[in-house]
Amino acid sequence: MHRIATRAAVIVLAILVVVLVAGCGGSSSAAVQKPSAAKAVGMLDARTLIDVRTPAEYAAGHIAGAQNIDVEAGDFASKIAALDKKAPYLVYCHSGRRSGIAATQMAAAGFADIVDGGAMADLVAAGAKTQP
């Protein structure tokens, strides 16, 4: 009888651990969407665009209307902290690596609606307009 009670207690404890672990961490990644480039282009007009490449890359050409906040610069966290966390954003970069990093950091900082637009070339190929 003692063995059955111990086994039941272990099962209940395991279920509680699974429920607690499943409940943790889901909120930050839920804020980040990763749509196809075509879908992301359809979202451009309704979002604040952030080019997370270096200032030199940005100066060489960027998606029309985007602002530049370099994700690898030391002041990235302070610059995003000044933004409205409830507003919708779309971040992009050269290859998609840095936009993923930026989107994850923004979600962790409490931003509620972030689209990881990925690579600028994919967005342009899907119809995004650029400016020098």
Where on the chain are the PLM-derived regions?
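Rhodanese-like catalytic fold shared by cysteine-dependent sulfurtransferases
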Residues: H2-M43, R47, P55-P88, R97-P132
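Short, surface-exposed ligand- or partner-binding patches at beta-edge/loop junctions that are enriched
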Residues: Y92
